[in-house]
From Swiss-Prot:
It catalyses: L-citrulline + L-aspartate + ATP = 2-(N(omega)-L-arginino)succinate + AMP + diphosphate + H(+). This is Argininosuccinate synthase. Homotetramer. It comes from Streptococcus pneumoniae serotype 2 (strain D39 / NCTC 7466). Its main location: cytoplasm. Gene3D superfamilies: Argininosuccinate synthetase, chain A, domain 2, HUPs, Single helix bin. InterPro entries: Arginosuc_syn_C (IPR048268), Arginosuc_syn_N (IPR048267), Arginosuc_synth (IPR001518), Arginosuc_synth_CS (IPR018223), Arginosuc_synth_type_1_subfam (IPR023434), AS_cat/multimer_dom_body (IPR024074), Rossmann-like_a/b/a_fold (IPR014729). PANTHER family: ARGININOSUCCINATE SYNTHASE (PTHR11587:SF2).
Length: 398
């Protein structure tokens, strides 16, 4: 009698490899690894899943879909959770969940498994997303169920022939994709400890970065980054290239004590060189092209959208409504930003746009000025009228 199939979100690490061995007692395990730009050896991961006991192993390249359908939303909405975290891991979980559900439907599986612990945000993101896409799918979380210590997990792995990674003594827990790299655990758990250089993986220390600045130009079309230094690139490729260029200059290091969805505080080290550079450049083009009312209201939407995405609600109607608003604002966001990369900083030093609302003839203080200064007198009287009336009423009441 054949076993029921379970779709496992597989990373190739110890947790999900041990999960295969544990799950295969009752299920035929189908391991699925998504390539969201983390730079892993995908052939090795594919083969390892089969070696450990999966009946099928899938490695799916979703970098382009991740960039255009998920990262772009965060980019255009300047998504920083608590004004610091560019939602690196939070962005990939809805896409991974979507693909797991699609594969479950394709092969007729009714169960999905993930390797999250019981104290992180990702368990919530996976399970809420999966439920939003198919309420009938069952979700199991072996790592959360075991509650094993690391030592117990290693012992189980060795007893069951699961290869134990050579770098298992690495104290850090790392997650990486196109939009950045997240690092936690080990010495980082004490917020008084400065993050050692070994905790960083894709950025150069600003102190060791080049002593000469580098200037780059990023072009945007309707809010989408379309070219880097004149070279037209797919969004995923552009981000990866920016990660290398800006990372070399130490851009995008973030040290954050954040409020997790599950109720605890966590100290995280993020490296987001491409993200920080793009977000900085994009904001400057918006400053040229958005009318004042949109420019002032959009940050309110951005903050709420960042919270919704962080808090596992990508597929909620609220999130989708706010995304629609963001997309509407981007129709005029066209132009090029020149960015100076130097010693950990990404600074926009020049910008231009065919949709620019900046009129130099109105702004200038030279003889070329076309601003009607005489109109200011009447404007001031009308603008200040409510304040004047209020002041007079207060005086008469005394």
């Amino acid at each position: 009698m054949s076993k029921e199939k379970v779709i496992l979100a597989y990373s190739g690490g110890l947790d999900t490899s041990v999960a295969i061995t544990w799950l295969k007692k009752d299920y035929d395990v189908v391991a699925v690894c998504m390539d969201v730009g983390e730079g892993k050896d995908l052939d090795f991961i594919h083969d390892k899943a089969l070696k450990v006991g999966a009946v099928e192993s899938y490695v799916i390249d979703v970098k382009d879909e991740f960039a255009t359908d998920y990262v772009l939303v965060a980019h255009q909405s300047h998504a920083y959770y608590e004004q610091k975290y560019p939602l690196v891991s939070a962005l990939s979980r809805p896409l991974i969940s979507k693909k797991l559900v699609e594969i479950a439907h394709q092969i007729g599986a009714t169960t999905i498994a993930h390797g999250c612990t019981g104290k992180g945000n990702d368990q919530v993101r996976f399970e809420v997303s999966i439920a939003a896409l198919d309420l009938n799918l069952k979700v199991i979380a072996p790592v959360r169920e075991w509650k094993w210590s690391r030592e117990e997990e290693i012992y189980y792995a060795k007893e069951n022939g699961v290869p134990v990674p050579a770098d298992l003594d690495n104290p850090y827990s790392v997650d990486q994709n196109l939009w950045g790299r997240a690092n936690e655990c080990g010495i980082l758990e004490n917020p008084w400890n400065q993050a050692p250089e070994e905790a960083f993986g894709i950025t150069t220390s600003p102190e060791q970065a080049p002593d000469m600045p580098e200037y780059i130009e990023i072009e945007f079309s309707e809010g989408v980054p379309v070219s880097l230094n004149g070279e037209v690139l797919k969004l995923a490729d552009l981000i990866q290239k920016l990660n290398e260029i800006a990372g070399k200059h130490g851009v995008g290091r973030i040290d954050h004590v954040e409020n997790r969805l599950v109720g605890i505080k966590s100290r995280e080290i993020y490296e987001c060189p491409g993200a920080v550079t793009l977000l900085t450049a994009h904001k400057e083009i918006e400053d040229l092209t958005l009318v004042r009312e949109v420019a002032h209201f959009k940050p309110i939407i951005e903050n709420e959208l960042s919270n919704l995405i962080y808090n596992a609600l990508w597929f909620s109607s609220a999130t989708q409504a706010l995304i629609a608003y963001i997309k509407e604002t981007q129709k005029v966001v066209n132009g090029t930003a020149k960015v100076k990369l130097y010693k950990g900083s990404a600074q926009v030093v020049a910008r231009k746009s065919p949709s620019s609302l900046y009129d130099e003839n109105l702004a200038t203080y030279t003889s070329a000025d076309t601003f009607d200064q005489d109109a200011a007198v009447g404007f001031i009287k009308l603008w200040g009228l409510p304040t004047k009336v209020h002041s007079e009423v207060q005086k008469s009441a005394k």
